[in-house]
């Protein structure tokens, strides 16, 4: 067992608090104080926690329980008197005039009922008196305080140890959700807004992808990414990171704009801050509990990490009467979600082969409940990750879930029995026996982390996944031909390659075993499938190209290629000409705005493979066509311009907005850059809006876009 785990496990292994003697308790409190201080520094200063929130809460609860049993033993340096950790070196120090305290925790519904009951008793409320309490998701990010004087942002700081934080003003100025100047009238002379700096799941994934492409380390989770980004000594690095901010409370305020918590949040919105749209107010404790469970169910769909729900008494005069206890306010409570980590046994490691030939190791686990969900599989990503974790079949491991993210192994519990052998990553594909290779990334010159099968469509696993992709919604979109049907038809030999789909009806007519006679099928369902297939013999060229499953070619790139080359025949002809990389055709491909070297190499390699060309020939013989896209308008005000959409649109779907923009001759991009001409910002726009402002790009709201688009 490693030293870092040993100290934690020893602290938890002590006897029950009820059985601790007066002689034993001081030693246990000393050990817990040291352990909690160590993990505070790892979390708040180094952004590198080694234990889960649940494990940390267990340490604190044990410390508090011992202090409650023996109040005369409470130490001056007790963790119950402390919030966070002292600021690290590297930034100037900022003293919080109003301490940034943490919240007391609730771990079940009964704790919430007790919280409401304690408040009622303290305030001497009658049974019929309404106790309004606000509720909002507890964001898993980094706390920050923003000071405004005469409406202008003058200083920002991290929480630090609650009394003294780090001056990160310049870094906070780069976050789009943080206004440089407050909007509206009657703004107090001094305003200190507090909230959470965080990173969305989408932005986190994109950041890690950029890190990988640049050969840099990836971040473990969005919180670490947000914390590491905010605490950069170079504000330019922070500016390049997609950070966001939710406002949820205040510190020093020369004059309050309302007499309720919810009223102050309304003022924050008017001043230009983003308040969580799920913020609400409840008049009964059961409504609070319903709110919590509703958020818990929606957690995976929010797009950012949360670890619970925060409750606050709404009336500020009642907050003042309730006051504080130790390190937390008596009028607020954090209702934490169940632990999202658990220990289990890794029974074996299996290799799955994806559509692009990627060999992905999957951990098969002894089933365990993690955050209310039974988990039996977890991703191990690639060979490098297996090596980094040092994981072997038979190990006891810690498994983590985060929202809708695939469960993953975060560490090995190092009490491995002797004789456990290392897992050897295969150098051949387990499905077809072809060589599995790690390609050289042309940008970094380093080997890719992912090994890929070289078998292409010869590989059964790739073939099935590519067929599923071919019929998917954004490709050929064949109704009635879903994942299960593709897998079954492939196994029975009915569909092995894309053109087999379009000859299925003709072959079925000659077959002794008709589709209608197969289990789960009938005459009507078979006829509907054949009709659906016939209806998709002609699709837009971008759908056709996307359906081919060329590595790195997504919907946007497929549309770019369709616009640039016009017809499938011309596209294929030019890609084959580009094979030697010296032909003008290769230079022309690279000249397309949005096509880089990696994408160009992938496209040319696809057409260089004989079996891929045979697929295209087969589709032509089956009468399948890629229809050229309609000509774009050239006289519209957005023709030739690059447009980016962000936030939630209310009067049209994102797909409708993109389609209209392209119809008007605009190029729709997925990210903001110096080449962007227009950003259309819907509700809850985030980092893209901030970057557009920074670059001086024209910004339109939804109504302005509709007026422009006509």
Curated annotation (Swiss-Prot):
Task: State its Enzyme Commission number(s).
Answer: 6.5.1.2
Give any Pfam family that matches. BRCT
The entry marks the following residues as binding NAD(+), namely 53-57, 102-103, 136, 159, 196, 312, 336
The protein's annotated catalytic reaction(s) are:
NAD(+) + (deoxyribonucleotide)n-3'-hydroxyl + 5'-phospho-(deoxyribonucleotide)m = (deoxyribonucleotide)n+m + AMP + beta-nicotinamide D-nucleotide
An individual GO BP term? DNA repair
What are the positions of the active site?
Answer: 138 (n6-amp-lysine intermediate)
* Cofactor requirement: Mg(2+); Mn(2+)
Specify whether Ligase is a keyword of the entry.
yes
Q: Which family is annotated?
A: Belongs to the NAD-dependent DNA ligase family. LigA subfamily.
Q: What is this protein called?
A: DNA ligase
Q: From which organism does this entry originate?
A: Parvibaculum lavamentivorans (strain DS-1 / DSM 13023 / NCIMB 13966)
């Amino acid at each position: 067992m490693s030293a870092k785990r040993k100290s934690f496990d020893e602290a938890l292994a002590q006897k029950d608090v009820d059985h601790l003697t007066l002689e034993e308790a001081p030693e246990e409190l000393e050990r817990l104080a040291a352990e909690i201080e160590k993990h505070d520094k790892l979390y708040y200063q180094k952004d590198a926690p080694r234990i889960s929130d649940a494990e940390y809460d267990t340490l604190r609860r044990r410390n508090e329980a011992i202090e409650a049993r023996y109040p005369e033993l409470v130490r001056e340096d007790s963790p119950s008197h402390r919030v966070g950790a002292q600021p690290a070196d590297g930034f100037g120090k900022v003293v919080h005039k109003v301490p940034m305290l943490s919240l007391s925790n609730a771990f079940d519904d009964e704790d919430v009922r007790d919280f409401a009951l304690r408040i009622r008793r303290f305030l001497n409320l009658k049974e019929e008196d309404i106790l309004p309490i606000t509720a909002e998701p507890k964001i898993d990010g980094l706390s920050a305080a923003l000071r405004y004087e005469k409406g202008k942002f003058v200083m920002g700081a991290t929480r630090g140890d609650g009394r003294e934080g780090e001056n990160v003003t310049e870094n906070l100025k780069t976050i789009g959700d943080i206004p440089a100047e407050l909007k509206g009238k009657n703004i107090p002379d001094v305003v200190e807004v507090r909230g959470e700096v965080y990173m969305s799941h989408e932005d986190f994934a994109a950041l890690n992808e950029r890190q990988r492409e640049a050969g840099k380390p990836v971040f473990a989770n969005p919180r670490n990414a947000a914390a590491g980004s905010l605490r950069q000594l170079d504000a330019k690095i922070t500016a390049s990171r997609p950070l966001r901010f939710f406002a949820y409370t205040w510190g020093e305020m020369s004059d309050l704009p309302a007499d309720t918590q919810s009223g102050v949040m309304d003022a924050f919105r008017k001043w230009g801050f983003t308040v969580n749209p799920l913020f609400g107010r409840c008049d009964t404790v059961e409504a609070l509990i319903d709110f919590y469970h509703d958020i818990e169910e929606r957690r995976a769909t929010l797009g950012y990490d949360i670890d619970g729900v925060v409750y606050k008494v709404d009336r500020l005069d009642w907050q003042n009467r309730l006051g504080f206890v130790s390190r937390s306010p008596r009028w607020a409570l954090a209702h934490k979600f169940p632990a999202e980590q658990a220990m289990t046994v890794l029974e074996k490691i299996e290799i799955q082969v994806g559509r692009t030939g990627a060999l992905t190791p999957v951990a098969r686990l002894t089933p365990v409940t993690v955050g209310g969900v039974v988990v039996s599989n977890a991703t191990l990503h690639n060979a490098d990750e297996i090596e980094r974790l040092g994981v072997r079949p038979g190990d006891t491991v810690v498994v983590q879930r985060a929202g809708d993210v695939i469960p993953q192994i975060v560490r090995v519990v190092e009490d491995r029995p002797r004789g456990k052998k290392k897992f050897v990553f295969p150098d051949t594909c387990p499905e077809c026996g072809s060589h599995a290779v790690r390609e050289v990334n042309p940008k970094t010159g380093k080997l890719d982390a992912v090994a890929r099968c070289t078998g292409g469509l010869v590989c059964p696993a790739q073939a099935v996944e590519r067929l599923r992709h071919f019929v998917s919604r954004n490709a050929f979109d064949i109704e009635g031909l879903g994942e299960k049907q593709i897998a079954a038809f492939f196994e029975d030999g009915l569909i092995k390659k894309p053109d087999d789909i379009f000859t299925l009806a003709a072959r079925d007519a000659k077959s002794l075993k008709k589709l209608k006679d197969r289990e789960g099928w009938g005459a009507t369902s078979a006829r509907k499938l054949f009709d659906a297939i016939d209806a998709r013999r002609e699709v837009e060229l971008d759908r056709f190209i996307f359906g081919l499953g060329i590595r790195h070619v997504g919907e946007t790139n497929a549309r770019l290629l369709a616009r640039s080359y016009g017809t499938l025949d011309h596209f294929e002809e030019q890609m084959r000409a580009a094979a030697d990389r010296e032909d003008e055709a290769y230079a022309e491909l690279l000249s397309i705005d949005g096509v880089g070297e990696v994408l160009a190499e992938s496209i040319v390699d696809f057409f260089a493979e004989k079996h891929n060309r045979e697929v295209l020939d087969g589709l032509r013989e089956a009468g399948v066509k890629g229809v050229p896209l309609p000509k774009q308008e050239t006289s519209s005000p957005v023709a030739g311009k690059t447009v980016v959409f962000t936030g939630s649109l209310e009067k049209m779907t994102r797909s409708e907005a993109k389609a209209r923009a392209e119809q008007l001759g605009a190029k729709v991009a997925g990210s903001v850059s110096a080449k962007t001409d227009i950003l259309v910002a819907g509700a809850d726009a985030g980092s893209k809006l901030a970057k557009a402002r920074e670059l001086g790009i024209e910004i339109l709201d939804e109504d302005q876009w509709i007026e422009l688009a006509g």
